[in-house]
Amino acid sequence: MIKLTQEEQKYLLDSIRIIPDFPKKGIIFRDITTLLNNKEALNFLLKHLKERYKDYNLDFIAGTESRGFIFASMICAKLNLPFVPIRKPGKLPFETFSCEYDLEYGSDKVELHKDAFKNIQNARVLLVDDLIATGGTAIASYELIQKAGAKCVEACFLINLKDLNGANKLEKLTSVYSVLEI
């Protein structure tokens, strides 16, 4: 497995702006727009991810709304693979599978087109998002991929917020790779 050195991780981490108390007091927000706006850091990240996934024999890359779309579609372009969106309820125009997950206060859902994987049985899918925190969205997305008859071979995140334990929960279901552990 290809992983970054500590020096390479620091380089990427330094390209992400930290905003304290956003969106509410006590939260430390990791603003990836500064990474997206840094062509050297972005190209370094994409080169790394292309190298990591080029031999996974993937059929599709699925990205979760909305920042997962950014990274998933760029990886798709690098690997010449189709992109599959996993969206919030009511955003996809055709028949969907949906999966509900718990939030701190309440619940939410994600949806996936029923024909997203073109009826390729056991299609090999990489799930991509910018960040994993508690794991609710990622686990629901994993379940949608399985429900659609595909196999999530790995979930990839730019950032893993380790203290919130989401990656540990998801690792019980599939392999997890996080570029940066915070």
Curated annotation (Swiss-Prot):
Per the record, the domain of life is Bacteria
Q: Does the keyword Transferase apply?
A: yes
Q: List the InterPro entries hit by this protein, alphabetically.
A: Ade_phspho_trans, PRibTrfase_dom, PRTase-like, UPRTase/APRTase
Which top EC class is named for this enzyme in its record? transferase
Subcellular locations according to the entry: Cytoplasm
Which pathway, per its entry?
Answer: Purine metabolism; AMP biosynthesis via salvage pathway; AMP from adenine: step 1/1
CDD domains noted in UniProt: PRTases_typeI
Catalytic activities: AMP + diphosphate = 5-phospho-alpha-D-ribose 1-diphosphate + adenine
- Cytoplasm: present as a keyword of the record? yes
Q: Which SUPFAM superfamilies match?
A: PRTase-like (SSF53271)
What is the annotated role of this protein in its UniProt record? Catalyzes a salvage reaction resulting in the formation of AMP, that is energically less costly than de novo synthesis.
Complex and partners: Homodimer.
List the HAMAP family: Aden_phosphoribosyltr
Q: What is this protein called?
A: Adenine phosphoribosyltransferase
What organism is this sequence from?
Campylobacter jejuni subsp. jejuni serotype O:2 (strain ATCC 700819 / NCTC 11168)
Q: Which gene encodes it?
A: apt
